[in-house]
Amino acid sequence: MRADLDALVIGAGPAGSAAAIGLGQAGWRVRIVEQHAFPRRKVCGESLSAAGIELLDALGVGAAWRAAAGPELDRVGWMSRDAQVIAPFPSCAQGRYRVGRALGRERLDALLLERARALGATIEQPARIRAVTGRPGLYRCLLESAGGHREWIATRVVIAAHGSWGPEPDFGSPGTGRGAPERPGDLFAFKANFRDADPGRGVLSVIAFAGGYGGIVEADDGRTTLACCIRRDALAECRREFPGIGAGPAVESALRRECGGLRRALARARREGPWLAVGPIRPGVRVAEPLARGLAGVFRVGNAAGESHPLIGEGITMALHAAALLSRRLAGEPPGMIDEARARAMQEGYALDWREAFSTRLRVAAAYSQLAMRPLLAGPAGAALRLWPGLLTEAARLADKARPAGLPPPLHEEPA
């Protein structure tokens, strides 16, 4: 059996589509399998840093994204029970852009997927990959369409961009622990969009509350995005306090009660669409798991590879950055030459690249999340920020919000 494809990408979020674009620019034959029809809303804070915007330029969608995105985010905010602080956002000293902006995922994901299609990728949507078997250079993947039709397709490598909380295909090797026992500290993520809210133009605010953290920002078309993560035990308490209204509205009610700044921001707001929820989320590093499981030709990207606590709002930028790192590693070898040894070497190099790029962000995000979720820490932090607002600017800088993309010259770059 010969490979029909050079790369099969599982998942058409920012990471999967960006990887497909990068490989398409290098002339690879790529197929993307996405389980949901587009456009679709997604649980996400929806902001993108200056580095992320530059990565979109390299992918060929920067101009379209900038034309649709919300205002420049030149200020950073902190909201808690007793404090509301705003400070200048740290500016990126290198590259074309100084600060980030926000755009809804239903628009971003569609832009990236259509760009991948324009570069020759074939799209199966909605569809799933149920099983993967084989070896680097020749994997057989069981594709199931929405109507239930099944077929086997052959590919040289697999790119797993299916996220971190949903089911993964059967790779014929021990799993990743997604069925771990429930714990009180498990985090569930929620998101809603609002009209007529007032989060402050150009302000990306962090929300600190007992048992969770969140963020609020003005995105495209005047919409406001509110997203948060809440511990399992705190969510259960919310539902007891606000029974009969659903998990999302219960969380919103608790946030309004706990946080004066958020209450003021949403005073005249009306929610657009239902609350969305996913989880439990899985902050941590998983980029090297395929190699440990004997899957040298299966490369993880996006949240499947690893994720930071969402508090720092770097998920999309990290996804695009990781996709660029991976596509450059893969495109360095002719696809027809990929075998076990070459795939293993690329896996090891990519994992090193990934850790070098993101390890600091993950550690800082983990520390910030604990500070925000614990009132005994968040209270003093809010008091300190009121006295010295510049600490908020430096905290954002420490979370790499002003870090340039720092990639080699792209395979293709969109004109400014």
Segments predicted by a language model, with ranges:
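Conserved N-terminal glycine-rich FAD pyrophosphate-binding loop of Rossmann-like flavoproteins
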Residues: 37-57
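A conserved beta-strand/loop capping segment in the N-terminal third of enzymes
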Residues: 53, 57-110
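Conserved Rossmann-like nucleotide-cofactor binding loop
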Residues: 15, 38, 165
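C-terminal helical "tail/cap" subdomain of flavin- and related membrane-associated enzymes
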Residues: 328-416
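Predominantly flavin-linked oxidoreductase catalytic cores and closely associated redox partners
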Residues: 115-265
